[in-house]
Amino acid sequence: MFGGLEPEALRRILLVRLDNLGDTLLTTPAFQAIRQVLTEAHLALLASPSGCEIGRLDPDIDETIVYHAPSEDVYFRLPQDPGRELAAVERLKERDFDAAIIFTSYKQSALPAAYLCYLAGIPLRAAGSFEGPGSLLTHRHRYKERVPPPHETLRGLELTEFLGFPPVEPEMVLVPHAEDEEGASRILEQHGVERFILVHPGASASSRGYPPERYAFVVKELHRESGLPVLVTGGPGERDLTSRVAGSVGISLGGETSFGTFTSLVGRAMVVVTNNTGTTHVASALKRPVVTVFAGTNPPEQWGPWRTPNRLLVHSVPCAPCYKRVCPIGHECLTGIAPRTVIGAALDLLDSPVRTTAEAVRQA
């Protein structure tokens, strides 16, 4: 490990993933690769508030540390506050980490996080970096350029293999707690629901959101044609969205679930319908059939559903992948996907036989 170190020398490891919930979930196979070797080590996850939700449902993680990284503040919501950053350095310094492993996606720089760990006195600092890191990184990996790019689950494993950790199966890890399962059961009992379809219309960027009026039509027709209730989920800031999408036939749950309870609901859904957002990866981790309405923001080969029955809906446009958070030209990549196509994909997955996890992996 780390160029010849014995596992016993790596007692306290900081795992860093500073972007969103789905990105962190896609890195859990790499966390598992580390845990399988460092069975007794303390593994802490430094992540965004949403990323820490993944850490809390990953048995390989011992501690989560919330950090609002300025390098990920794409909407400029964080006030400039050097004191806040120095306090973050002190929090890490107090924990006396032996090593930090920094995970990033394509187009992200590992160097802001590397500098944070450098200031915190963490002696070993590893990441993949296209940029020259100087002494900010003690172990630098150069990711291989591939077209099309590999799935994001494999990117983290490429870094851990570079560091000497044996490969593991690229399966995401997400385990709801007992209280999450109980919360999901209460919601279903409250609404008299057993078998159901789950629709999650929100996304962290507007460029990845299928139009709400189209989702509303999808919900209405799925309920009519399948005879199943349709749960429409969303976060606290999405109550209006879920209510609008649910209409008079769906069950709006915007802001009514914790992430753990939401995860448990996804795990029980007959089929999940969503955008290219974290919910796609939650469904993949739990081996639930998923329809992903995929915007042209990112390569679908890299960010689409993984090892689960799925229908990946893509409308090709010349501007894809744009990597934009707001579409400046009319969302043709999404408006080009007809609601009937979404409905047909969901009904097709509903008609597929129920599969075990192993069977789902073989099909995918």
For the regions a protein language model found, what residue spans apply to each?
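Catalytic machinery of carbohydrate-active enzymes
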Residues: 1-364
